[in-house]
């Protein structure tokens, strides 16, 4: 076998490898494109949802900000996936370099956000919701979205307060209702007793632990959604992995293009 034949075979193998990287990069970027489209769809649905979820989100600044963060991330991933697909198919070095720099910035930002969210998840979340409950929960004002949402949560999950019934101490609820230790939504229900369904409403409102729900809603909701939280965490790891591979493929393709 001559040197020319060996060189030609090496060039052919290099070309095949480059083509493989190009199509792998296209596949990974198409997945990023689909992920961005999904986040955009979820964000738009929450913003325009006519069933009332829009009002709940609008009433809570944290949720309101979160929806627009989802929209922004969805838009960036949508654009990122599109640029990556175009750069791979067209073998455009400028597009590939721009794609690499953009996805590197997003990757580092997502990684930092995930680490911070994991480190501060419990302390900040409990602290925030407890503070908001004390400031805004009114008890029986069902025209107030914040109050009606909390009533629905406490009735659905048979819980009381964020951490415990003691969260209502020194709250606006106690100022409005000084004779009640906890709101009616905290009272235990028994559908076989009377029309109201309460085991003993009066004893509950006066503070008796026997007739109220003593578990905090934070723990109750986290326990209920525990599986979904792990799924969300797994999806975040998958997204970060896809982005990492996309960066590697982009740089390999960039270096391989003559």
From Swiss-Prot:
The keyword Transmembrane applies. The gene is tspan18b. It comes from Danio rerio. Belongs to the tetraspanin (TM4SF) family. The chain crosses the membrane at residues 26-46, 62-82, 95-115, 229-249. GO terms for biological process: regulation of angiogenesis; regulation of sprouting angiogenesis. Pfam families: Tetraspanin (PF00335). The keyword Cell inner membrane does not apply. Glycans are attached at residue 141. It is a multi-pass membrane protein. GO terms for cellular component: plasma membrane. This is Tetraspanin-18B. Residues 47-61, 116-228 are extracellular. It is found in: Membrane. Keywords: Glycoprotein, Membrane, Transmembrane, Transmembrane helix. May regulate angiogenesis through KDR/VEGFR2 and NOTCH1 pathways.
């Amino acid at each position: 076998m001559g040197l020319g034949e060996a060189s030609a075979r090496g060039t052919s193998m290099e070309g095949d490898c480059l083509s493989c990287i190009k199509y792998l990069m296209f596949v990974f970027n198409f997945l990023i494109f689909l992920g961005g489209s999904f986040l955009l769809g979820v964000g738009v649905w929450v913003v325009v949802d006519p069933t009332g979820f829009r009002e709940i989100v609008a009433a809570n600044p944290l949720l309101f900000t979160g929806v627009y963060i989802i929209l922004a991330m969805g838009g960036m991933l949508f654009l990122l996936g599109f640029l990556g697909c175009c750069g791979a198919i067209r073998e455009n070095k400028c597009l590939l370099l721009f794609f690499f720099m953009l996805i590197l910035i997003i990757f580092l930002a997502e990684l930092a956000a995930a680490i911070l969210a994991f480190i501060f998840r419990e302390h900040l979340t409990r602290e925030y919701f407890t503070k908001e409950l004390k400031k805004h929960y009114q008890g029986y004002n069902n025209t107030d979205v914040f109050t009606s949402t909390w009533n629905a949560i406490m009735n659905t999950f048979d819980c009381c307060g964020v951490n415990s019934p003691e969260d209502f101490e020194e709250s606006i609820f106690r100022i409005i209702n000084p004779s009640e230790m906890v709101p009616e939504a905290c009272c235990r229900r028994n559908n076989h007793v009377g029309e109201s369904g309460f085991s003993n409403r009066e004893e509950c409102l006066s503070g008796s632990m026997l007739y109220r729900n003593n578990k905090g809603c934070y723990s109750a909701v986290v326990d209920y959604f525990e599986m979904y939280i792990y799924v969300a965490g797994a999806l975040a790891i998958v997204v970060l992995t896809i982005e990492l591979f996309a960066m590697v493929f982009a740089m390999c393709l960039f270096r391989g293009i003559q």
